[in-house]
């Protein structure tokens, strides 16, 4: 019992440390380079000065919450595409597994793969076991700065919720160009 009481504060400290590792609104976004399920390699440089980027990290392909979240991005695709924003989901799963996952959901956007976890680590979302990412979403402005960090994702409506926030975050609407 005593060791359990000692373990609880340590877990709370570990949780607060990982939350402290997340980039904050206004910080420069971490540099990233990840392969998408469409075979292309995406980097932060591809979007810098051009458009905002959404990267929605999820733990594992073919699991309940991750499936709901990816479907949300599929269903809200037209709402997101109305803005000057590129949107991706991302995980530490290998590219082939994410390709199978994307195909099973008939997704029309790329899932980014980070099998070594180096990008997830840079974003502060890599779980302690080093094998999966925590569910956290980043909206990165065209200037490369973090506009929003969401670590309380509602998987069923996540992309719709993001689409509603884009204007207030200063992401231009395509018709405004």
PLM regions: where:
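Short loop/turn microsegments at loop-to-beta-strand junctions
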Residues: 29-30, 52, 134-136
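Thiol-/selenol-based redox modules, centered on thioredoxin-like
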Residues: 133-177
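Short, internal strand/loop/helix patches
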Residues: 34, 88, 98-134
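Bacterial N-terminal signal peptides
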Residues: 7-15
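Short active-site neighborhood of thiol/selenol oxidoreductases, capturing the structured segment around
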Residues: 44-67
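Positively charged n-region of N-terminal signal peptides that target proteins for export
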Residues: 1-5
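N-terminal "domain-start" segment that seeds a small globular fold
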Residues: 18-45, 167
């Amino acid at each position: 019992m005593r060791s359990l009481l000692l373990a609880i504060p340590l877990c709370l400290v570990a949780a607060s440390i990982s939350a402290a590792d997340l980039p904050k609104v206004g910080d420069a976004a971490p540099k990233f380079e990840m392969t998408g399920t469409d075979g292309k390699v995406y980097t932060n440089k591809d979007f810098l000065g051009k458009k905002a980027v959404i990267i929605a990290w999820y733990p594992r392909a073919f699991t309940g919450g991750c499936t709901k979240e990816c479907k949300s991005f599929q269903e809200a695709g037209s709402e997101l595409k109305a803005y000057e924003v590129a949107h991706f989901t991302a995980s530490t799963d290998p590219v082939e597994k994410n390709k199978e996952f994307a195909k099973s959901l008939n997704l029309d956007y790329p899932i980014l793969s980070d099998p070594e976890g180096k990008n997830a680590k840079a974003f502060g979302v890599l779980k302690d076991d080093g094998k999966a990412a925590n569910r956290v979403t980043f909206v990165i402005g065209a200037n490369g700065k973090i506009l929003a960090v969401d670590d309380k994702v509602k998987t069923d409506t996540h992309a719709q919720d993001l689409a509603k926030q884009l204007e207030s975050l200063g992401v231009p609407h395509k018709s405004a160009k």
